[in-house]
């Protein structure tokens, strides 16, 4: 009997990379001329980014700097869920961005439906915040990976534990 192969579909954000990107972005903000004397800041509180600045325009600039640094460090920006801009103390504005870790039930169902529509001999299991795909043929697994990558999901997915 042939051994089954499998892999896991996950959605993870590496927090050390996020911290590094924040530090680089803060360094750039401190050195930029248009931010001289401004109260712009980026903080990471557990899995929530807090962006603070003087006004909405500068907040957008801070967000642009942060996104560029996150992209350079290969952090998926699809997994950032921005809240609304709110006023903070001292005539500043603040925006929270939640880092989405793991695949929620709705996205797991979407991935499951994508795989089932292919009509290959593969089995899928939703395990907490990941989806495991098993099959006897590694070619089928490769086809599943290609299909899931080709679909535009609201979160960024990675494929791990390919055995």
UniProtKB/Swiss-Prot annotation:
GO CC term, one of those recorded: cytosol
One GO MF term: nucleotide binding
Enumerate the Pfam families for this protein: DUF520
Q: Which UniProt keywords apply?
A: Nucleotide-binding
Q: Which InterPro entries match?
A: DUF520, UPF0234-like_C, UPF0234_N, YajQ-like_sf
Q: Which family does it belong to?
A: Belongs to the YajQ family.
Give the protein's function.
Answer: Nucleotide-binding protein.
Q: What is this protein called?
A: Nucleotide-binding protein BcerKBAB4_1061
* Species of origin: Bacillus mycoides (strain KBAB4) (Bacillus weihenstephanensis)
């Amino acid at each position: 009997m042939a051994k089954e192969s499998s892999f896991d579909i996950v959605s993870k954000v590496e927090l050390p990379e996020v911290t590094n990107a924040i530090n680089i972005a803060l360094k750039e903000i401190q050195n930029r001329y248009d931010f001289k004397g401004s109260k712009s800041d980026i903080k990471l509180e557990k899995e929530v980014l807090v962006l603070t600045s003087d006004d909405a325009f500068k907040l957008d600039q801070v967000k642009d700097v942060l996104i560029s640094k996150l992209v350079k460090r290969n952090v998926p920006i699809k997994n950032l869920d921005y809240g609304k801009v709110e006023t903070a103390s001292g005539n500043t504005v603040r925006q929270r961005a939640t880092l989405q870790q793991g695949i929620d039930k709705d996205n797991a169902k979407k991935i499951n439906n994508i795989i089932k529509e292919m009509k290959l001999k593969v089995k899928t299991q939703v395990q907490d915040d990941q989806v495991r795909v098993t099959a006897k043929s590694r070619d089928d697994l490769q086809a599943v990976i290609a299909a899931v990558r080709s679909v535009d999901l609201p979160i960024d997915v990675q494929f791990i534990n390919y055995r």
